[in-house]
Amino acid sequence: MLVVEVANGRSLVWGAEAVQALRERLGVGGRTVGALPRGPRQNSRLGLPLLLMPEEARLLAEIGAVTLVSAPRPDSRHHSLALTSFKRQQEESFQEQSALAAEARETRRQELLEKITEGQAAKKQKLEQASGASSSQEAGSSQAAKEDETSDGQASGEQEEAGPSSSQAGPSNGVAPLPRSALLVQLATARPRPVKARPLDWRVQSKDWPHAGRPAHELRYSIYRDLWERGFFLSAAGKFGGDFLVYPGDPLRFHAHYIAQCWAPEDTIPLQDLVAAGRLGTSVRKTLLLCSPQPDGKVVYTSLQWASLQ
């Protein structure tokens, strides 16, 4: 059972698996409203949580696909405990990262020492080959080899002297400690500690669910459910002057075909609004869909296009 947190009339889904299940199995897309963990200072691409329209949340609750719960409020009495737990986890993470950084630096140092040793051996072998090539250069080559061996011996002696001193300097084995400014902080995309949440009844009006019983919500929901049962995907259409955008399939694959406007059967539609909505829909290559539920439960649809703009 998927969980949807509701607070002040906003229904949020926090789990990535739940978002995927809603889109693939139930045809409910919602819209992401959260900042990306790696790009918190931009809003061109958003991430979790997923915000559901009230009609989407109610539909999912009615068919038993999700459980609506009231989002837990922070308790000031537990604030100090939560802060202590957070600091402890941060310190444990710092110690773990410090150990991993020291291990990585030590591995790199060993790799460099191996390369230095290989280079010294190759240089010595080259000098030995050059010394046996001609007897006329034997004296000079042997003298150069002695000088190189002397310098290499001095360098290795210095390294041997530096080795014990660095190992005795501290537990870091000569590796600089990781500064706290380099600490990687994990940005949680879900609640790290479980909390108790009480179920929310969408049939009863409350602070978290103020939509129950409102005529506008009941009108929109009846039309939303009818279109959803016909296999359409729906999303909000505020910027297109409608109630819903109607897609023939997943919005990631299709453009919207209709701009749905919800009207009660007894409502009168001003001619100016009707013309404006028709012109707007045609200009964005969509058809205006006038939707009105009937007393028998059926929904009547009327499509409208502005022919002069086609």
Curated annotation (Swiss-Prot):
Positions of the catalytic residues: 247, 255, 286
Listed GO MF terms: lyase activity; nucleic acid binding; tRNA-intron endonuclease activity
Biased composition (Low complexity): 128-144
SUPFAM superfamilies: tRNA-intron endonuclease catalytic domain-like (SSF53032)
Record GO cellular component, one term: nucleoplasm
Major localization class: nucleus
More info: Belongs to the leukocyte receptor cluster (LRC) present on 19q13.4.
Family as reported in the entry's similarity comment: Belongs to the tRNA-intron endonuclease family.
Name of the protein described by the UniProt record: tRNA-splicing endonuclease subunit Sen34
Organism of origin: Homo sapiens
Gene this protein is translated from: TSEN34
